Each structure stands twice: as structure tokens, then as C-alpha cells.
Amino acid sequence: MKILVSACLMGENCKYNGGNNYSEKLHEFLKGHDVIMVCPEVMGGLPTPRLPSEIVGDRVVNSGGIDVTNEFVLGANKAMEYITGIDMAILQSRSPSCGTNEIYDGTFSGNKIKGDGIFVRMLKEKGIKVVDIKDL
């Protein structure tokens, strides 16, 4: 299988705080599969580290109040260039790019709501199966 994954889950230090979300469980699952790693946020030109961002209505805003929607959309569009032939995507939980079925509520309080990140919305529109890492 050809599987697209959030780069942070593979140990790439592209998370907003400069770290990663390496998953040994994912690493084991991916053995024998073709893997494509993406970080839509970095692909959209956002630095690492960066202020955390959350979806607020139809915009993405960082904790400093700056609208970063354009960067998130640009990065998601660039990441979409890598989907040809993929069988599924396994992505980071609650991310404003990669969150699947659950994201933070936009108040930077840690509260979660039902919803998808920007990149996940695009993947689902193309009929691609998206799995949250916590559901693997």
C-alpha cells in the first residue's frame, strides 16, 4: 500500500513547538508499505517553531491573533500534489491541518469539537480514506 503520513508522526521536527509526535506503533504498521511524509504547515511556509494555530469559523488564526489561513491553504494544496496513487492517509490528531473528526475549538483553551483540519477536508473531498493516528 501507498500511505501518506503526517511528517511529525515519523519523527520530523515540524510540529508548532519545534518537536515531533513520533509514533512507534505507526512506524511498525508502515513496514513494507510505500510512505509519503508531508507537513502541510511547513509546506505552506510557516516556520518551526511557530505559534499554535486553531480553526476559528472559516479562518485559521494563531495564538497571537494573526490570520494564517492563506499559509494553511497553500500548504494543504501543496501536500495534495503528493496524493496520486495513495491508498490512505494517517494523520496527526486535532491539528488544524491534519486533525480528523476532532479539532480544537478555536479558543486556545484545550477544548475540542467535531471537525476536520484544512488538509483533511481536501483529502476527504477526493474520497481518500483518512485515519487519525489515535485510531490506528
Residue ranges and their predicted role:
Residues 11-18:
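Short N-terminal binding/cap micro-motifs at the start of the first secondary-structure element
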Residues 37-40, 89, 131-133:
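General beta-strand structural signal in soluble alpha/beta enzymes
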Residues 1-4:
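Extreme N-terminal starter segment of soluble prokaryotic enzymes
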Residues 8, 92-95, 135:
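Short, well-ordered beta-to-alpha junction loops that form the rim of enzyme active sites
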Residues 43, 52-55, 59-81, 111-136:
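Divalent-metal-activated hydrolytic enzyme cores
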Residues 21-62:
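Short, surface-exposed acidic-centric catalytic microdomains
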Residues 22-36, 74-89:
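Short amphipathic alpha-helices and their capping/turn segments at secondary-structure boundaries
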Residues 78-107:
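N-terminal glycine-rich phosphate/adenylate-binding segment common to multiple enzyme folds
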